[in-house]
Regions:
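Hydrophobic alpha-helical membrane segments
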Residues: 1-340
Length: 340
């Protein structure tokens, strides 16, 4: 009975979201110069590519040829699948086509600069079993210096393989979500629930379910990359499985931790469109002051990217510590059962 009670507490010992955010902020300021160097040297090219691609995708006219072709293809797929015409699906089609275009445009930078930044930050925050005892006792060790290039290079293949697998998993999550939406609207059509009110209600429920499914998949894939960067010999599907085990019972905490940094990146993207893209369209040229502002906004976006990596590393470490504590709690109970 005691053993069952111990198992029932599994998944509730991880640090809450506020504690993880405080620890991540503490780690960031402890290694401020190192992390900002990573943001300026590695994350900045990726952030600039994302901002430029977002601006090109959101341009009213003329839209890129690839974006127009992608939007037309998605529109044809939605019509062939039987989705009813509604503002929700029109907005979903536009946003999905912009997301796919931005992902494809920034993919070379994501596979190089972003993954190198993740490997570098994870190497700085990795637990070192060979470190002195006084450092191991600290809850969140400080960051002394940038990691060696060899350590980052050794971790890069595992990070790359896990990132590519995560991209396919995200594609599968989107396909599964759209399949469920198609089944829901097909069932509503068979039951005669085709009024505007029912369509609006199903669209709202579908938006919530789609956001949750894609959000959880994104959290798992992001954490899997951190696992691949911090755990030697763990890459690809093994890293994804370990990430799934780590967030078991902590999905709400993982989603809450992903929200602040993603809001920061979204704010930087909106600020770039308001301060840089709008002035570029109005004046017809990019003034030096506007170019400097664009560089500053891209750097802010890069800092948010680095903060997201730090939060993921700290959260994974808290999950590992929670699992170790649960195992230590179970050991005396199992010994007592054996003696009995």
């Amino acid at each position: 009975m005691r053993r069952a009670g111990g198992l029932s507490r599994a998944g509730h010992g991880a640090a809450p979201a506020a504690g993880v955010m405080r620890a991540a902020a503490s780690a960031f300021f402890a290694g401020y110069h190192c992390f900002t160097s990573v943001a300026a040297l590695l994350a900045l090219p990726f952030s600039a590519a994302v901002l430029v691609a977002e601006a090109a995708a959101a341009a009213p006219a003329p839209a890129p040829v690839a974006l127009r072709a992608l939007a037309a293809r998605l529109r044809a797929v939605f019509a062939a699948a039987g989705f009813p015409p509604s503002p929700f699906f029109a907005l979903l089609e536009a946003k999905l086509s912009q997301t796919v275009f931005t992902f494809a445009a920034a993919l070379p930078f994501a596979l190089t600069f972003l993954l190198l930044a993740k490997a570098c930050v994870a190497a700085m925050l990795r637990d070192d079993a060979a470190s002195p005892r006084r450092h191991r006792r600290r809850r969140w060790p400080g960051v002394a210096a940038l990691p060696a290039c060899g350590a980052v290079a050794r971790a890069y293949p595992a990070v790359l393989a896990t990132h590519v697998l995560g991209a396919f998993l995200m594609l599968s999550a989107n396909a599964a979500a759209f399949s469920l939406l198609l089944l829901a609207f097909g069932a509503a059509d068979l039951l005669g629930l085709t009024s505007r009110a029912w369509t609006l209600a199903l669209s709202a429920a579908g938006a919530v379910a789609y956001s949750l499914a894609v959000g959880v998949a994104a959290v798992v894939c992001n954490l899997a990359v951190v696992v691949a960067a911090t755990e030697p010999g763990c890459a690809g599907h093994a890293a994804v499985l370990r990430a799934c085990v780590a967030i078991r019972g902590r999905v709400s905490t993982a989603l809450a931790l992903a929200l602040p940094t993603n809001l920061g990146m979204a704010a930087a993207e909106a600020l770039f469109g308001l301060r840089v893209v709008a002035q570029r369209r109005r004046d017809g040229r990019l003034a030096p002051a506007v170019a400097a502002e664009a560089f500053s906004i891209a750097y802010i976006h890069a800092v948010c990217v680095v903060l997201e990596i730090i939060v993921a590393c700290v959260f994974y470490r808290s999950c590992k510590r929670s699992e170790a504590d649960e195992l230590r709690e179970l050991e005396p109970e199992e010994k007592g059962d054996l003696q009995a």
